[in-house]
């Protein structure tokens, strides 16, 4: 006979960190946009993606979806005391500029904007061209 289950674990409340300065990493691909807000060492405080905000399919790649994802991540980071961020943008997607603007609109002060998109030195073969 199976032993009776012990009491369910209480969900632990997220501890509130007091971090005023951090980094915002925006990865914008052709299919999705992911916004991660970290402290200066790179430990993630909050993140959000276009898909996680509620968009599916081709709507994930829109600038509006990137805007909502950035607002959501900024709101969570401000709960930890975040006030100023340096932005690192990666990828060719359409949500790059919109995500940066919505971070500012959410109340985070943007210190610097860096493009860290990786450039291939003749590495992998790129996908074939679309014929529409």
Curated annotation (Swiss-Prot):
InterPro entries, alphabetized: Ribosomal_uS11, Ribosomal_uS11_bac-type, Ribosomal_uS11_CS, Ribosomal_uS11_sf
Keyword presence, Ribosomal protein: yes
PROSITE patterns given in the database record: RIBOSOMAL_S11
Superkingdom of this protein's organism: Bacteria
Transmembrane segments: none
Keywords: Ribonucleoprotein, Ribosomal protein, RNA-binding, rRNA-binding
A Pfam family assignment: Ribosomal_S11
Database matches in Gene3D superfamilies: Ribosomal protein S11
Keyword field contains Ribonucleoprotein: yes
GO molecular function: rRNA binding; structural constituent of ribosome
GO cellular component: ribonucleoprotein complex; ribosome
A biological-process GO annotation: translation
Family: Belongs to the universal ribosomal protein uS11 family.
Assembly information from the UniProt record: Part of the 30S ribosomal subunit. Interacts with proteins S7 and S18. Binds to IF-3.
Record PANTHER family: 40S RIBOSOMAL PROTEIN S14/30S RIBOSOMAL PROTEIN S11
Function: Located on the platform of the 30S subunit, it bridges several disparate RNA helices of the 16S rRNA. Forms part of the Shine-Dalgarno cleft in the 70S ribosome.
Protein name: Small ribosomal subunit protein uS11
Organism: Leifsonia xyli subsp. xyli (strain CTCB07)
């Amino acid at each position: 006979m199976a032993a009776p289950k012990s009491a369910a674990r209480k969900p632990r409340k997220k501890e509130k960190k007091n971090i005023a300065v951090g980094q915002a990493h925006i990865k914008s691909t052709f299919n999705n946009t992911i916004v991660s807000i970290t402290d200066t060492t790179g430990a993630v405080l909050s993140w959000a993606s276009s898909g996680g905000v509620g968009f599916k399919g081709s709507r994930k790649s829109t600038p509006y979806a990137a805007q909502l994802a950035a607002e959501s991540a900024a709101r969570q980071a401000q709960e930890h005391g975040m006030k100023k961020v340096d932005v690192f943008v990666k990828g060719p997607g359409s949500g790059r500029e919109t995500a940066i603007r919505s971070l500012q609109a959410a109340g985070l002060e943007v210190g610097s904007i860096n493009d860290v998109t990786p450039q291939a030195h003749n590495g992998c073969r790129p996908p074939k061209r679309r014929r529409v």
